[in-house]
């Protein structure tokens, strides 16, 4: 692929030109452009008067000397109105059944068919052949048709289990459009003086026939990496498990992959990237219910698996668990260990402080911080005499939290290993240790594992940063992926500070 970044820049500028004067239709224009550049079909769903036909007309200007055909279907539409009238001369002179196709669908590069579901069987059958094989049977001859983009539109979906489903399945990209929502865009639309039929694309940006044919071959050379295929397979398996998921044919999956290849190609990449999979949200849905379901499943895939977010969190959880185990082992070694007294005839077990503890005020460190009396506590100061009395006779024990303020009542106990343990209101405990005996910093094993995990996170974030320069992916999706990666990074950094 020659000069991939220049091609990506050119396609971006081409799309910007096509979008001029159209408000809140950038995503639709970009996907229709992608479909046109890869020879696919688009279905636009939405109420009348929202620029569905204008979108199709604009796409004609993406190509040099492209011809367009536009038709509004009715229940009374005939094949002659779409594919051309019969040649009376050929029928009369030579007895040949032949259509005059000039100016009709068989000779158009860009085709727009409005109210598509009102077409009759005679039109539908011929249209299916045109979409599938890019061929048109004209009498005794089979003619190749130049159609690069078919845009079909309607304000309703086809009825389930109808003869229209075969045609609907050929519409790879499906877009649900609505009227202009933003106030500023609505005002701009009302006051715009631009002629909608003017060509907004400079000649230098228009695609030539030679370029189009060459790109079709180069799109097929874009590779599908193993890790991207695994993501697609995960999505397919997940959809198969959901009872309300739409049926997705093998044909649709295969055509969708070519669309992903085209997205990568026109983004300047030589391989499909996880970010391209977001396009599947506009390819796999069938109706309103499945539209939401597909978007949810792809969102989970993108924010949880595509850049190993969930895998990194799982690794982080294992590292944290190992750190806790090491902390517990260290606590057993460094905790303040009391001396058990005989007390054979005593109803309560008695203890005393180790002989090397002689200070009148003892500052004991919590092996892990606890929230006590609405305060994050890391150490507690005890009067030696009060602690000795509690060890001997029990009752109430008080200490200064973090060594400040008045002494507060504490839930203190001696565990089976003769260590002092303080508990919070939820009964979470923390073993107490003398200053200097608590391990400082992260163990080397944990530190190394966290550094390796952070390095992997940086690699994944760098990959996403490189891949997100994709014209065909909405910014809000990229924002959610960035947030998911930043959340993983924040959790790793937090673990490094423990």
UniProtKB/Swiss-Prot annotation:
Any one GO MF annotation of this record: ATP hydrolysis activity
InterPro entries assigned to the protein according to its UniProt record, in alphabetical order: AAA+_ATPase, ATPase_RavA, ATPase_RavA_C, MoxR, P-loop_NTPase, RavA-like_AAA_lid, RavA_ATPases, RavA_LARA_dom
Catalytic function, reaction form: ATP + H2O = ADP + phosphate + H(+)
Enzyme Commission number(s) from the entry: 3.6.1.-
Binding sites annotated in the UniProt record for ADP: 23, 49-54, 196
Originating gene: ravA
Organism of derivation: Shigella flexneri
Principal place of residence: cytoplasm
Domain of life: Bacteria
Pfam families in alphabetical order: AAA_lid_8, ATPase_RavA_C, bpMoxR, LARA_dom
Family: Belongs to the RavA family.
Role, per record: Component of the RavA-ViaA chaperone complex, which may act on the membrane to optimize the function of some of the respiratory chains. RavA functions as an ATPase.
UniProt activity-regulation remark: ATPase activity is stimulated by ViaA.
The protein's name in its UniProt record: Regulatory ATPase RavA
Subunit structure: Homohexamer. Interacts with ViaA.
Keyword tRNA processing attached: no
EC category name: hydrolase
Subcellular localization: Cytoplasm
Record's GO cellular component terms: cytoplasm
Keywords: ATP-binding, Chaperone, Cytoplasm, Hydrolase, Nucleotide-binding
